[in-house]
Structure formats: structure tokens, C-alpha cells
Regions:
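Acidic donor-binding loop of glycosyltransferase active sites
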Residues: 97-99, 265-279, 287
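A short, well-ordered alpha-helix in the C-terminal region of glycosyltransferases
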Residues: 340-354
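Conserved nucleotide-sugar phosphate-binding/catalytic loop shared by glycosyltransferases and other
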Residues: 4-12, 34-79, 85, 232-234, ...
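Conserved donor-binding/catalytic loop of nucleotide-activated donor transferases
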Residues: 118, 265-267, 281-292, 312
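Active-site-proximal region of nucleotide-activated glycan assembly enzymes
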Residues: 57, 116-180, 188
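Donor-nucleotide binding loops and adjacent catalytic segments primarily
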Residues: 45-46, 50, 54, 177-184, ...
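Glycosyltransferases and closely related glycan-assembly transferases
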Residues: 87-101, 107-123, 136-141
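C-terminal alpha-helical cap of glycosyltransferases
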Residues: 353-372
């Protein structure tokens, strides 16, 4: 067999799975430029565009997740899984990987399950503090399990766990501009406290309604300003509302912020959902954060992610059902509290794992070398 490394990386569905996957691939390629890397994702999901844009080949499986509310619909899902296992087997036979890496998401289940049945060593990358069902099943045969939180032996064999942290998207740790320039780029005033609200690329209704319900409070702030990513799903509705009510001068809003490094550089305080990837970014940057976990995720894992930080005084937690009423007043009080900001920043920075992508790449490469 050739000396080149051949590695499959499977998963996706959301940026929280895709960014770590690409970061791992980039780290492998930096260390071993000759490595052949193939992604396996889910047809119709964002990885089918994001991965090729990052310079990697991807194969798609016609996979979908289980419907946890309407169980009768899962008959079709089971049939798709059977089909996807056959397709994954064909991909694995053609590509002949020495290692298969799973980062979570619909495609990782059948791909890694088939890889394990074919004797291909697997590496799991579990981003959350509460492991999902698929990873718990795959972990029984996984060679290595890379995690971002302490205490994951609750879910996985302790002798195969490695505390690596979560890889984050490229470019965050080397901001392209100063805080002053970053604030100016959003049309806001340097020297004022700045709150960044991000509800994900599609948006978060509760967080958006918190802003819309507190526009008079926002307008009344003379020393606090806001950068608000509304999400594409709510764009038309919010544009119409702002046209009707008038946009405060101290509020910048957009359906999507493509340059998150600049947005983070501008922010004194962040308000966000509690996805594992986002939390890893806040840790790496030492950003004070208020977390509003999404109630619409499997096993309520975002709440568990948030509480893992709250237990270490590294974040503030607001339940989704309370956000409409309490989120904006709390954010304004917090961003004006220097001692609180400093404490949050220091404590969250302690949780950072800045070398996560390189550490995981080293694990994958070492395993591949032994398998060749």
C-alpha cells in the first residue's frame, strides 16, 4: 500500500460540526501535506457547500435524523439508514482509509459504524458535555474519543478518552483589526461598551424577540451599543419591524455576520446559544458571555454545556423561557460591571484548549501510521 495517509472525516449538519471537521483536516494537511482526506456528509446539508469551499472533496449520503416527536415517521428514516450503510461501505472500499473520524451529525453514524465493522480504526470527536446517542453507540468500538469537557467517562470508556478541546474555525485568534476599528466597521462608536448578540446563522426567535421587546431600553442607553445577528430566517420580519419602529442609532443589525473575528473583536460581552463550537470560541478568546441554550436540541445538550461553564463561574446562564423578559436588562447591567466582566473573562479563558485541532490531528496521524 502507498505510504500516503488516507483519512475519512464524517459528519456535519451545522457549523458546530463542520468548523471542527475542517479545522482537523487543515491541521492534518499542515502536518502531512500528502495526506488524502475525504469528507462524508449528508445530502442537502450545509457541509455539501462548506467543505468544498474549504478545499476538500465530499461525498453525500441521503441520511436524515430521527423525528423524536412523530415516531411513526422514523420507518422511512430506518430505510434510509440501511441504504446509507450500503453507500458508506462502497465509499470506504473505494477510498481505503486507514482511519475514519466522526465529528457528529447525521452522516457520521452509518459511516463510522460501517468503518468499525470493516476493521477501520475510528476516532470520535464529541463536542458537547453530554454525549449524544450515536456517539455513545460508536464509542464501544472507537480507538480514541476526543472530548472537550471533564467527566466524559460517564458516557465513554475512560481508557480511550483524550481531553483535547474543540477545534474552532480558522482566523479567530489573530484578529484583523483593533477593538476601535472593529467597532467602527459596524458603524458604531469606539469607547462605548458593545454587546454582541448571535443566535446562529438561521437565528433564534427568543433572542430576537428580546431585542424587539426592549427597543425603548436600547434607545435609552447612552454608553452601551449593540451588534445583532438576526439570522436569515427572521430577516424579512425584522427588517419590516425596524422600518416601522425606527432603528436606534446604537444598534447595528444584519441577518448574517460573515466576519466573526471582527465581531468578537468589537464585543465586550457576547449573548449566544450554547452550542459546543461557539463555547469553544468564547473560551479561546476569553469573551464574557451570557448563554441562552436552545430548547430544540437533542438531550437538551446546550443547557448541559452552559451549566458546565456556570459551575466554574465562566458564564451567565439564562433559560430560553426567561430571555424575552430578562435578557437585555441583564446584559446591560453585566456589560457595565467591570469586575464581573473581568471575572468572567479570566474564568472562561482557563477552559481554553488552543491546540485542539493539532492535538486531534496528531492522534489521527499516529493511528493511521500504525494501520498502514
Amino acid at each position: 500500500m502507498s505510504d500516503e495517509l488516507r483519512i475519512i472525516i464524517s459528519g456535519g449538519g451545522t457549523g458546530g460540526h463542520i468548523f471542527p471537521a475542517v479545522s482537523i483536516a487543515d491541521a492534518i494537511r499542515r502536518k502531512r501535506p500528502e495526506a488524502k482526506i475525504l469528507f462524508v456528509g449528508a445530502e442537502g446539508r450545509m457541509e455539501m457547500q462548506r467543505v468544498p469551499a474549504a478545499g476538500y472533496e465530499i461525498k453525500g449520503l441521503p441520511i436524515a435524523g430521527f423525528d423524536r416527536k412523530r415516531l411513526w415517521r422514523n420507518i422511512a428514516v430506518v430505510m434510509k439508514i440501511i441504504k446509507c450503510r450500503k453507500l458508506a461501505a462502497g465509499i470506504l472500499k473505494d477510498f481505503r482509509p486507514q482511519v475514519a473520524v466522526g465529528v457528529g451529525g447525521y452522516a457520521s453514524g452509518p459511516t463510522l459504524n460501517v468503518a468499525e465493522s470493516m476493521g477501520v480504526p475510528t476516532v470520535l470527536q464529541e463536542q458537547n458535555s453530554y454525549a449524544g446517542v450515536t456517539n455513545k453507540l460508536l464509542a464501544k468500538k472507537a480507538a480514541k474519543i476526543c472530548v472537550a469537557y471533564d467527566g466524559m467517562e460517564r458516557f465513554f470508556p475512560a481508557d480511550r478518552i483524550l481531553l483535547t478541546g474543540n477545534p474552532v474555525r480558522a482566523g479567530l485568534t489573530a484578529p484583523k483589526c483593533t477593538n476601535e476599528d472593529a467597532v467602527k466597521s459596524f458603524g458604531l462608536q469606539p469607547g462605548k461598551r458593545t454587546v454582541l448578540l448571535i443566535g446562529g446563522s438561521l437565528g433564534a426567535r427568543t433572542m430576537n424577540e428580546s431585542v424587539l421587546g426592549n427597543l425603548p431600553l436600547i434607545k435609552a442607553q447612552t454608553d452601551v451599543q449593540f451588534i445583532w445577528q438576526t439570522g436569515k430566517y427572521y430577516s424579512a420580519e425584522i427588517n419590516e419591524e425596524m422600518s416601522r419602529r425606527g432603528k436606534p442609532d446604537n444598534l447595528y443589525f444584519s441577518d448574517f455576520i460573515s466576519d466573526m473575528a471582527t465581531a468578537y473583536a468589537a464585543a465586550d460581552l457576547v449573548i449566544s446559544r450554547a452550542g459546543a463550537g461557539s463555547i469553544s470560541e468564547f473560551c479561546l478568546l476569553g469573551k464574557p458571555v451570557i448563554l441562552v441554550p436552545s430548547p430544540n436540541v437533542a438531550e437538551d445538550h446546550q443547557t448541559k454545556n452552559a451549566l458546565a461553564l456556570v459551575q466554574k463561574d465562566a458564564a451567565i446562564y439564562v433559560p430560553d423561557e426567561n430571555a424575552r423578559r430578562t435578557l437585555l436588562p441583564l446584559a446591560i447591567n453585566t456589560v457595565n460591571d467591570n469586575a464581573k466582566l473581568q471575572s468572567l473573562a479570566e474564568n472562561i479563558l482557563k477552559l481554553a484548549k488552543p491546540n485542539a485541532a493539532d492535538d486531534i490531528a496528531d492522534i489521527v496521524i499516529a493511528l493511521a501510521e500504525r494501520t498502514k
